[in-house]
Design a protein with these regions (language model features):
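Class I SAM-dependent methyltransferase SAM-binding "motif I" and its flanking Rossmann-like core
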Residues: 1-64
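A contiguous loop/helix-start segment that scaffolds small-molecule binding in enzyme catalytic cores
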Residues: 63-174
């Protein structure tokens, strides 16, 4: 009991922690600034987490209007969770919100694709894909150098508010 149930082999494993950039951060940086405001990351793998718990998290993200980064979106045997997640999020936001499919980030075959939530095709996604679903305020811009997706932080609302009033007071007046 003093060893905490850890095997001799496990005690010999060295754990090294190194700072880095996560796939969701890389996907956002490569595609604009979709993570410019509140966001969450949800694994769609139900190998260690019951699907009911994952569904609850997706509903919470939808109700909170968070940008959602899905990792472990599909596997060879697990193809239904991403479609279910799409349907859940469409209860909270329109099918026209931008979606980024970021595959093989940092590898020679890296690929960034832009879709909408309603147009998300599960067959375009594999285990090396990070799926980023925009919030209701996220926008896609088609620029001269390609597309970009961003999520505004709301500063424009504060800049447009009448002087001397807080934003929530202004919204109550309208």
């Amino acid at each position: 009991e003093a060893d905490g149930g850890v095997s001799d082999a496990a005690r010999r494993v060295q754990v090294v922690s190194a700072p880095g950039v996560s796939a969701l951060q890389a996907a956002s940086a490569r595609s604009g600034a979709i993570l410019g405001h509140d966001f969450c990351a949800i694994s769609l793998s139900d190998l260690l987490t019951p699907w009911e718990a994952i569904e609850k998290r997706i509903h919470a993200a939808g109700a909170g209007d968070f940008v959602v980064a899905f990792y472990n979106p599909v596997s060879k045997r697990r193809r239904t969770q991403l479609a279910a997640a799409r349907e859940i999020l469409m209860q909270y936001r329109g099918g026209d919100v931008p979606v980024i499919l970021a595959s093989s980030l940092g590898r020679p075959d890296e690929k960034i694709q832009y879709r909408t939530l309603g147009g998300l095709d599960i067959d375009e996604v594999d285990m090396l894909t990070t799926v980023m679903v925009g919030a209701s305020s996220s926008k896609r811009l088609d620029l001269g150098r390609g597309s970009a997706v961003y999520t505004p932080r709301g500063y424009a609302k504060h800049l447009d508010a009448p002087q001397g009033k807080k934003q929530d007071e202004t919204e109550a007046d309208t």
